[in-house]
C-alpha cells in the first residue's frame, strides 16, 4: 500500500506519518519546507521521542519526500492508495489544486482502484471541507468520476505534539506524548476498509469529534488563555495553578454535560476522560507554550469551534456555562506579537468595544445575557 501525506511538520512526522510508516505502508511526505524535504530524502528516516511515564525513542524509516508544489506530488496522487493531511485548517485550500490535478490525471490514466483522502486536522469534518476546495478546483467533467472513485473520509485526531526543542538541532527529530487517537468515519471509505494499527473506525464520528473538541481542545485553549493572563509560560505551569485548574475542569464538565445529553455518553466514563485530559496537560515532558496553544483566537472564538460551540450546547439544553464564559473572556484578552489574529482581535475590541466585537466574532447575539456575562468577566480582568 502506498500513501502520500501532506505536511511534514511535527504532527505529520510524529503522529499520522509515524502510524502509516509503522503499518508498513510505503510513505511519501509532501511539504514546502526544503530543509525538511532534503533531510528526509537524505536519510529516509527520523526519530520520534515518545514521552510520558515510560519514555522511548522510535525510529521511523523507509520514508521519502516531495515538494507539495510541482509535478511530482500530482503524479503521486495519481498512483497512491491513501492521501492524508496534517497541514493546519487554513492550508487545506492551498493544497486542493494539486489534489484536483492528481485526481484528473488518475482518471486520465484509467485507474479504477479507489483512493481515500483523510484530512487529519484540528477541525470538525475537515475532509468534507477539503473536498469542497478540491471540487472548486476540479473541471466539471471530472466531478462524477471523482465522486464514484475517491473517498473523502472525515476523522478526529488527538495527540499533543509541541514544537521540537531538539538538543541536536535535528530538523526531523520530534517529541510526542504517549496518548494518541485517530478515529475515522468508516461510512465514507471507497473500497475495502484499511487495517492500520492506531486508526479506529466508527460509524458515529461526530460523537468522537465533539468529545475531543469539547474536552481536549476546549480545556487546552482555556488553560492557555487563563495561563497567559496569569503570566504562566507553559500549559503544565498553568494547569498546576489551582485557580486555573478549577475553571478548566469546570468548563470541561459543562461541555461534558452537553455531550452526555447529546450522545448519551456514560457520565462516569466521561468524568474519567476529563481526568485523563487534565493528566495530559500536566505531562512534565511536554514543554507546551501557552502562546502556541492560544494562537488564532478569532478561529477559536468562532461559532463552530472549541469555545462557542460547547457554549451553544449549554444554551440549547439549558445547562450551566459559568466556566466556559470565563474561558471566552480570557480568550478575548489574548495578545501575541507573533499572531496576526491576536492583533486583529485587539484592534476589533479597540474599535467596536468587547460586546460588539464578541458578537461579530462568535455569531452570538450582542444583546444576549451570555454576551453580557462574558463582557463583565472581560472587564473584570482588565
Swiss-Prot record:
InterPro entries, per the entry? 6-PGluconate_DH-like_C_sf, 6PGD_dom2, Mannitol_1_phos_5_DH, Mannitol_DH, Mannitol_DH_C, Mannitol_DH_CS, Mannitol_DH_N, NAD(P)-bd_dom_sf
Name the coiled-coil region(s): none
One GO MF term:
mannitol-1-phosphate 5-dehydrogenase activity
Q: Which domain of life is it from?
A: Bacteria
EC number, UniProt record: 1.1.1.17
> Keywords of this protein's UniProt record, alphabetized?
NAD, Oxidoreductase
Where NAD(+) is bound, by residue?
Answer: 3-14
Q: What chemistry does it catalyse, as a reaction equation? A: D-mannitol 1-phosphate + NAD(+) = beta-D-fructose 6-phosphate + NADH + H(+)
Oxidoreductase is among the record's keywords: yes
* GO terms (BP aspect): mannitol catabolic process
Q: Might you report a single GO cellular component term?
A: cytosol
**UniProt-listed PROSITE patterns:** MANNITOL_DHGENASE
- Pfam families according to UniProt: Mannitol_dh, Mannitol_dh_C
Q: Which HAMAP family match?
A: Mannitol_dehydrog (MF_00196)
The family this protein is said to belong to:
Belongs to the mannitol dehydrogenase family.
Task: Quote the protein name from its UniProt record.
Answer: Mannitol-1-phosphate 5-dehydrogenase
User: What gene is this protein translated from?
Assistant: mtlD
Amino acid at each position: 500500500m502506498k500513501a502520500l501525506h501532506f505536511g511534514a511538520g511535527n504532527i505529520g512526522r510524529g503522529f499520522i506519518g509515524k502510524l502509516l510508516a509503522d503499518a508498513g505502508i510505503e510513505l511519501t511526505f509532501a511539504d514546502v519546507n526544503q530543509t525538511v524535504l532534503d533531510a528526509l530524502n537524505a536519510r529516509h528516516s527520523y526519530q520520534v521521542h515518545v514521552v510520558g511515564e515510560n519514555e522511548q525513542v522510535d525510529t521511523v524509516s523507509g520514508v521519502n519526500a516531495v515538494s507539495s508544489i510541482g509535478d511530482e506530488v500530482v503524479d503521486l496522487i495519481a498512483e497512491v492508495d491513501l492521501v492524508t493531511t496534517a497541514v493546519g485548517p487554513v492550508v487545506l485550500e492551498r493544497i486542493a489544486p494539486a489534489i484536483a490535478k492528481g485526481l484528473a490525471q488518475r482518471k486520465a490514466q484509467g485507474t479504477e482502484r479507489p483512493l481515500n483522502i483523510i484530512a487529519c486536522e484540528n477541525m470538525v469534518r475537515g475532509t468534507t471541507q477539503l473536498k469542497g476546495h478540491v471540487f472548486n478546483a476540479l473541471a466539471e467533467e471530472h466531478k462524477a468520476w471523482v465522486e464514484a472513485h475517491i473517498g473523502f473520509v472525515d476523522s478526529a485526531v488527538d495527540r499533543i505534539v509541541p514544537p521540537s526543542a531538539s538538543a541536536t538541532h535535528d530538523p526531523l527529530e520530534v517529541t510526542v506524548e504517549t496518548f494518541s487517537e485517530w478515529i475515522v468515519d468508516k461510512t465514507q471509505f471507497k473500497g475495502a476498509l484499511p487495517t492500520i494499527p492506531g486508526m479506529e473506525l466508527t460509524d458515529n464520528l461526530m460523537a468522537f469529534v465533539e468529545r475531543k473538541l469539547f474536552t481536549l481542545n476546549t480545556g487546552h485553549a482555556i488553560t492557555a488563555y487563563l495561563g497567559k493572563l496569569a503570566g504562566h509560560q507553559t500549559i503544565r505551569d498553568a494547569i498546576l495553578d489551582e485557580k486555573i485548574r478549577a475553571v478548566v475542569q469546570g468548563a470541561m464538565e459543562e461541555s461534558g454535560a452537553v455531550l452526555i445529553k447529546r450522545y448519551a455518553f456514560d457520565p462516569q466514563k466521561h468524568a474519567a476522560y476529563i481526568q485523563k485530559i487534565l493528566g495530559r496537560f500536566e505531562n512534565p515532558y511536554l514543554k507546551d507554550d501557552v502562546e502556541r496553544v492560544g494562537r488564532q483566537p478569532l478561529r477559536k472564538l468562532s461559532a463552530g469551534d472549541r469555545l462557542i460551540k460547547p457554549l451553544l450546547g449549554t444554551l440549547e439544553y439549558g445547562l450551566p456555562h459559568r466556566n466556559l464564559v470565563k474561558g471566552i473572556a480570557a480568550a478575548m484578552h489574548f495578545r501575541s506579537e507573533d499572531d496576526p489574529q491576536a492583533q486583529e482581535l485587539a484592534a476589533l475590541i479597540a474599535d467596536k468595544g468587547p460586546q460588539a466585537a464578541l458578537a461579530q466574532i462568535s455569531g452570538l447575539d450582542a444583546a444576549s445575557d451570555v454576551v453580557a456575562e462574558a463582557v463583565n468577566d472581560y472587564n473584570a480582568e482588565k
